[in-house]
Amino acid sequence: MFLALRELKQSKLRYGLIGLIMVLLSFLVLVISGLANGLSYDNASSIQNMEANKFVLADDAENKLLRSQIKKDDVDNVVNQVGEKEAVPFRVKVSTYEKKDSSKKVDVAIFSSERDSFLEPKIVKGEKLGTANNEMVADESIKEKGIDIGDTIIDPVSKKEFTIVGFTKDQMFSHTPVVYVNEDVWGSISQPNQKDYSAIALNADKEIKNAHVIDKKEVLQSIPGFKEEQGTLTMIIAFLLVIAALLIGVFFYVITLQKTQQLGVLKAIGTKNSYLANSLVVQALFLSVVAMVISIVLVQGLEQILPAGMPFLLTTPMIAQYVAIFIVISILGTLISLYQVLKVDALEAIGGGM
């Protein structure tokens, strides 16, 4: 430990440069991870936050909610097997509504399910859906579109007017805010091919016969654009981590080669290989931890100045995960240098410098 920290102190510029590179790389990893998670949440938070672990969709829907059409008989089949409280059918469609007395239009995803079920949205402002057929509860992000509680929006199919009575939170679908309506009104606002249920949300682990049951992850992966967005950003993150490991490895390898004579002297006076190897690992750990701490501070600062509509979400578990990954790749990056330290011969190293 003493040797590692003393060397860091003596060679501030050398280690400062690699530290700066590590800060930039870890900062990029955190930013892209935040964007990936934010896009994921912006695309599918309504499904992610459902208190359901499985879904029943139509066999021919390719696991896509917007394609799925489930008949009432199929719903009864599932409900009879698991119970009414554990199986809740719901409908989904996307549409463009227009604000009353305004030319302002807003894209929305319309959800409809039974009242007082586990799919009912939690209200953060205003009131929950009542029995009236002209009310809607919307995700609070709709305020960015100029729609607030008390405003009226018009359905393009039925020309029916709906008043926003409450806001919920974290309810997005396909990058559009979700609005909730009563089941009774669905028939008037849907096209002829949209009358059936889209899916059945299950809050049970029972085996269900004569039904196409999939888990939540499969539903998320089938939302338009979800898999493609996440795949692209995950690949970028993976490349950044590989680049970080290579840079750390090359840096410490070059440093170790430059210190061959000093390492030989240390070995000649009785310093053990384990002590020298430990010093190298401590340096890598110190730099990676400092780099991650600085990166986290920078990312949190960036998060404060990002526009409200920017899909950015970085949770504490995610940060902890990347801190652990970065520490691991820092240690892996020193492996080739550790081998170089172990194979240094004291006599050859000292003699080579004479």
Language-model segments: residues:
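Short helix-loop junctions at transmembrane helix boundaries
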Residues: N278-S279, L285-I331, L335-G352
